[in-house]
């Protein structure tokens, strides 16, 4: 149904909410009998869920002051804002929101709220009381002033004890209870344009009539509204501007408006956007989120009273979003959108004209809505949206009273609110205590489930009976016929479960798993009776709690409304035999009350459009069509701002056209044109012809009963300018461009904007020219990069177009090119440095004419950064040089030659002194050949000289003499053998070590001489003489063995060292002399003589061996004495010489063998 009064449009009246119908539960509903065309708005306490209101009444047939402490004070609530007679003959009428003209007798419009009430009475009275009319205030006052959505409010009935309780016998006549009603916020209606159509009756039973002219009906049937959505939209638009404070509201047929139970949703859309693919939560910007419980005063969620949790969120949709993309809305895990049904389909997001922006689906497991964007986001930009969601405490996750922190989220951005969950208490009167709620509505099967707690306080109750009535019950437990009913008969499903003494019932009054309780249904087969739409169960005397689950049928009204009510009561007897009653009534109503009088549809409100054209104004005159080159401009963003501040944007088409429709008469709108890049707005109001001029970048227009297609604007291309000029070689270095000075090519030039951002880079051409093009007015910075081998010349020496502006300069463009930004460079001269390294023999640090250069000294050149840029060596004259150097700072490093010492530095003029091992030098436009250094030899030496001389002389002299003489003589024989062996060995080892060292530091000289002489002389002489002679024989044997060994070892080691630092000289000399002398002499003489012989022997042996330095030998002096040997027997001499020869030969062989 259409309830334009409750829609929030994107106008000054607020934002349109695409509402779903709701169910609500309450005890009483009152209203006028005026029937208006349209769909009954089904109110409720949850999104898509009928929520039962529990109104409990108790009565006692007997006065008993002693039981007053068990009684509870009852305050009944009503939801009407109009005053009507409350009696059973006045059925609840459909709320019909029509646009009708007021009549003289017209009652003010009221909108009945639907909520589940727990209005309970527990009284017994001695006399009946008159039924008072409900005090109802019109609910349209708020609607007229604020044009807000109707919000469902529910209030839990207080469970206070009623101290004014009287009793009467159970046989007395019941009295009527006094009912006080309380206004509540009206319920919002559903935007029919985004609803799914419902089946319609076969006949047209609703017409829209004009209250001021009832004879002229407007022939708008439900079928027409269903089949002609445009007609319905027109009704909506027509209705949206109606003053509902004085006029009835037009509604659409039920067949077009889907019923939603407890579906308190409001959607409001401000601006369209663009889409991507898949989830685009990151492209959704949440601007505001709030959570409110009920009226927001105490944050107490009275769950049995249907107090809702309202979640409001506002967000914008990025222009990158595309059709098919999705976003998410998350409910808290402890709430549920629908309290009675499984229909959780979320409402579509629409714009003020009813066009769908996104469609939603609900995931019950995750309690998340996923919205999928339509092509709306491809057509529009800068979309802003608002969403209001109503939910209710999920009794499955929150079975008992508690405190919660509820968290909701839009596109993953969360907000939280602390709430207290409050459940109803049982109604108690004497031993009677009972409570009930509706728990499930099945619209397809047309059934309603009710759960009843019997004796939840586990009192000892006597003669207990429980009635289940297909209608409400009054304060005395009597059946009260009237609006709303169910069917209670033998086909009604009634289950009874016993609660064990150790089991606690959840305070939520809702059981999800009955298997935990004892099923005692069969025990009531003979204790259950049906009569007049009432079932009675006889419990007898009990002290346990029981649960009754009732599933009853209901009959929908002809227009599909849910007019459902069902009551239950418990009665017990006290010790006096009087009955105590306690009762609850649960019901669902499906109407909004309005004031009396017939109404007709107000004439359709006409909607208008604005727009037109964006063009390129080539001649900048602000008038269309004055230049043949003018053309339309496509893709220009145009934004419409509604009176309430919301916006909607489109882009011009290929013909430069744009248009906004669905605008209301008398309202003021603003149209803004975004200036395209590279363009400027043209002249405004260049002519008096409003359809040919330009209205500028922003224009405000008021709709005056007609379309306005004259809102045009023009743009012209922003002029572009050039900047640049010249880079030249300033050969004379005067900073002025001369005619004969050439340009420098390939010089890099960088252009920056006023923020320092680089916007261009180029290089000069062959003639030194450069240029930056397509520049806007503004300040720019130009930077020239110094070419290799050049130096910047002086700057700003003359006129701006002929001088050099330096390496960095600022250029200003103001409606003209700027070609004056030049820079000059001259070739950077190259320089040399170096000089001389010499041997400073006199150590005075000055170069003398007699002192010579040192060759091959390594010289290293470093730049200012310490980087090695050159290495060379001095030539044969000690000269070195580095060339091709720029002006700058350098360091020269001399590598000290081995064995030399650094001479003193800086002793005289710079070109003749020594500058040291490291010299810092600065070249400024000239060579520098003053960088010298000198070295000398130091006197002291650090020398280690080791001379090791080893002389070994081994002499072996062996003399073996064997003399055998055999003489046989009859004579007398005298034989004399004399052998003399003399071995003389002289070994002389001479070692000479000479070390000459000159050093600046220590000198260590070590000389080690080892001389070893080994002489072995062996002389063996064997002489055997056997003489037998008769005669006299004289035998003389002379043996001389001379062994002369001369060993001369001469070692000379000379070490001469001169070093600046540490010198080590080691001389090792080894001389080995081995001399072996062996003399073997064998003499055999055999003599036989008969004569007398006289033999005399004299053998002198004087060998001498002398070894002298340098091998000087002395001759042996001659032996003095007689040498007359003439008388020696010749034979003896022969034998002696033979023996000597043998000895010498034997000795030579022996020596050779060694």
Curated annotation (Swiss-Prot):
Pfam families hit by this protein: Big_8, Gram_pos_anchor, SdrD_B, SdrG_C_C, YSIRK_signal
Bias type Basic and acidic residues, positions: 61-75, 92-108, 130-145, 221-230
Residue numbers carrying Pentaglycyl murein peptidoglycan amidated threonine: 1120
Positions of the propeptide removed during maturation: 1121-1154
Cellular component per GO, a single term: extracellular region
Bilayer topology: Peptidoglycan-anchor
Transmembrane domains' residue ranges: none
CNA-B domain span: 607-719, 720-829, 830-940
InterPro entries: Adhesin_Fg-bd_dom_2, Adhesion_dom_sf, Fibrogen-bd_dom1, Ig-like_fold, LPXTG_anchor, SDr-like, Sdr_B, SDR_Ig
Motif, LPXTG sorting signal: chain positions: 1117-1121
Role played: Cell surface-associated calcium-binding protein which plays an important role in adhesion and pathogenesis. Contributes to the resistance to killing by innate immune components in blood and thus attenuates bacterial clearance by interacting with host complement factor H/CFAH and modulating its activity. Also inhibits bacterial opsonization and killing by interacting with host complement regulator C4BPA and thus inhibiting classical complement pathway activation.
Family assignment from sequence similarity: Belongs to the serine-aspartate repeat-containing protein (SDr) family.
Assembly description: Interacts with host complement factor H/CFAH (via C-terminus). Interacts with host complement regulator C4BPA.
Name of the protein in question: Serine-aspartate repeat-containing protein E
Species this chain originates from: Staphylococcus aureus (strain USA300)
């Amino acid at each position: 149904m259409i309830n334009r009064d409750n829609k929030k449009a994107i106008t000054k009246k607020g934002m349109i909410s695409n509402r779903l119908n709701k169910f609500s539960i309450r005890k009483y509903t009152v209203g006028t009998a005026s029937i208006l065309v349209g769909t009954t708005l089904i109110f409720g306490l949850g999104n898509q869920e009928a929520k039962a209101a529990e109104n409990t009444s108790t009565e006692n047939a007997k006065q008993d002051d002693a039981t007053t402490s068990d009684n509870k004070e009852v305050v009944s609530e009503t939801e009407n804002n109009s005053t009507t007679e409350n009696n059973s003959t006045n059925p609840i009428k459909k709320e019909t929101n029509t646009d009708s003209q007021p009549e003289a007798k017209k009652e003010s419009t009221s909108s009945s709220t639907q909520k589940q009430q727990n209005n309970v009475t527990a009284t017994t009275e001695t006399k009946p009381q008159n039924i008072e009319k409900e005090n109802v205030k019109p609910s349209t006052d708020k609607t007229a002033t604020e044009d807000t959505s109707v919000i469902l409010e529910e209030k839990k009935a207080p469970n206070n004890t009623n101290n004014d309780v009287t009793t009467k016998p159970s046989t007395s006549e019941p009295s009527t209870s006094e009912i006080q009603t309380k206004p509540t916020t009206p319920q919002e209606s559903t935007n029919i344009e985004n609803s799914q159509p419902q089946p319609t009756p076969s006949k047209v039973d609703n017409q829209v009539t004009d209250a001021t002219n009832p004879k002229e009906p407007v022939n708008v049937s439900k079928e027409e509204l269903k089949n002609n959505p445009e007609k319905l939209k027109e009704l909506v638009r027509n209705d949206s501007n109606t003053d509902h404070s004085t006029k009835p509201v037009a509604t659409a047929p039920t067949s077009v408006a889907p019923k939603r139970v407890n579906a308190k949703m409001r959607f409001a859309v401000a601006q369209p956007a663009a889409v991507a693919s898949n989830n685009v939560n990151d492209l959704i910007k949440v601007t505001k989120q709030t959570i409110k419980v009920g009226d927001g005063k105490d944050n107490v969620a009275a769950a049995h009273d249907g107090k809702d949790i309202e979640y409001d969120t506002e967000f914008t949709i990025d222009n990158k979003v595309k059709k098919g993309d999705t976003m998410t809305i998350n409910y808290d895990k402890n709430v549920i959108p629908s309290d009675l049904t499984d229909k959780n389909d979320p409402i579509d997001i629409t714009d003020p004209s009813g066009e769908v922006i996104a469609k939603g689906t609900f995931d019950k497991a995750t309690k998340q809505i996923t919205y999928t964007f339509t092509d709306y986001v491809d057509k529009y930009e800068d979309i802003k949206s608002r969403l209001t969601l109503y939910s209710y405490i999920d009794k499955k996750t929150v079975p008992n009273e508690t405190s919660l922190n509820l968290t909701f989220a839009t596109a993953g951005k969360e907000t939280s609110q602390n709430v207290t969950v409050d459940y109803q208490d049982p109604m108690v009167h004497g031993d009677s205590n009972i409570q009930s709620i509706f728990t499930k509505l099945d619209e397809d099967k047309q059934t309603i489930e009710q759960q009843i707690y019997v004796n939840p306080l586990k009192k000892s109750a006597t003669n207990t009976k429980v009635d289940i009535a297909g209608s409400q019950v009054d304060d005395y437990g009597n059946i009260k016929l009237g609006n709303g009913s169910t069917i209670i008969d033998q086909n009604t499903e009634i289950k009874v479960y016993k609660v064990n003494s150790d089991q606690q019932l959840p305070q939520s009054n809702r059981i999800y798993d009955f298997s935990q309780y004892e099923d005692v249904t069969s025990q009531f087969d003979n204790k259950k009776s049906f009569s007049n739409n009432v079932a009675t169960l006889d419990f007898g005397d009990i002290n346990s709690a029981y649960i009754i689950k009732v599933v009853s049928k209901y009959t929908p009204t002809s227009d599909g409304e849910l007019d459902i009510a069902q009551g239950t009561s418990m009665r017990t007897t006290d010790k006096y035999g009087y009955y105590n009653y306690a009762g609850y009534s649960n019901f669902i109503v499906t109407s909004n009350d309005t004031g009396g009088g017939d109404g007709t549809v107000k004439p359709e409100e006409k909607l208008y459009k604005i727009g037109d054209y964006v063009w390129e104004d080539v001649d900048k005159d602000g008038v269309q069509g004055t230049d043949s080159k003018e053309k339309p401009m496509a893709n220009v963003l145009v934004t419409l701002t509604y009176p309430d501040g919301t916006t909607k944007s489109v882009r011009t088409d290929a013909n430069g056209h744009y248009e906004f429709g669905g605008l209301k008469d008398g309202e003021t709108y603003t149209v803004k044109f975004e200036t395209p890049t590279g363009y400027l707005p043209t002249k405004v109001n260049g002519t008096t012809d409003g359809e040919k001029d330009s209205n500028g970048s922003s224009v405000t227009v008021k709709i005056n009963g007609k379309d306005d297609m004259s809102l045009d604007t023009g743009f012209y291309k922003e002029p572009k300018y050039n900047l640049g000029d010249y880079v030249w070689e300033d050969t004379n270095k005067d900073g002025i461009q001369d005619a004969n000075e050439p340009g420098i090519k390939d010089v890099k030039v960088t252009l920056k904007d006023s923020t320092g951002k680089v916007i261009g880079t180029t290089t000069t051409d062959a003639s030194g020219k450069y240029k930056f093009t397509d520049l806007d007015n503004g300040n720019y910075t130009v930077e020239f990069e110094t070419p290799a081998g050049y130096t910047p010349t002086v700057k700003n020496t003359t006129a701006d177009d002929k001088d050099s502006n330096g390496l960095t300069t600022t250029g200003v463009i103001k409606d003209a090119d700027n070609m004056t930004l030049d820079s000059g460079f001259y070739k950077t001269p190259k320089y040399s440095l170096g000089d001389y390294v010499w041997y400073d023999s006199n150590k005075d640090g000055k170069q003398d004419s007699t002192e010579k250069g040192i060759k091959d000294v390594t010289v290293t050149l470093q730049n200012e950064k310490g980087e090695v840029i050159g290495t060379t060596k001095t030539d044969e004259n000690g000269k070195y040089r580095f060339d091709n150097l720029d002006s700058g700072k350098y360091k020269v490093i001399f590598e000290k030659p081995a064995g030399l010492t650094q001479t003193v530095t800086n002793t005289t003029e710079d070109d003749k002194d020594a500058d040291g091992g490291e010299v810092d030098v600065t070249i400024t436009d000239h060579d520098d050949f003053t960088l010298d250094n000198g070295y000398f030899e130091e006197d002291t030496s650090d020398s280690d000289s080791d001379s090791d001389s080893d002389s070994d002389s081994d002499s072996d002299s062996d003399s073996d003499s064997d003399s055998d003489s055999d003489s046989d003589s009859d004579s007398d024989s005298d034989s004399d053998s004399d052998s003399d062996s003399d071995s003389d060995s002289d070994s002389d080892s001479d070692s000479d070590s000479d070390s000459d060292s000159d050093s600046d530091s220590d000198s260590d000289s070590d000389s080690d001489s080892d001389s070893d002489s080994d002489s072995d002389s062996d002389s063996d002489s064997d002489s055997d003489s056997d003489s037998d002679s008769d005669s006299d024989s004289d035998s003389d044997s002379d043996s001389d063995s001379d062994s002369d060994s001369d060993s001369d070892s001469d070692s000379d080691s000379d070490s001469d060292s001169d070093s600046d630092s540490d010198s080590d000289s080691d001389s090792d000399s080894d001389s080995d002399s081995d001399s072996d002398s062996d003399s073997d002499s064998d003499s055999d003489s055999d003599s036989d003589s008969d004569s007398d012989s006289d033999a005399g022997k004299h053998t002198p042996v004087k060998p001498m061996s002398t070894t002298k330095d340098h091998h000087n030998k002395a001759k042996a002096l001659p032996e003095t004495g007689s040498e007359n040997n003439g008388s020696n027997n010749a034979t003896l001499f022969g034998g002696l010489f033979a023996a000597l020869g043998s000895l010498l030969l034997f000795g030579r062989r022996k020596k050779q063998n060694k």
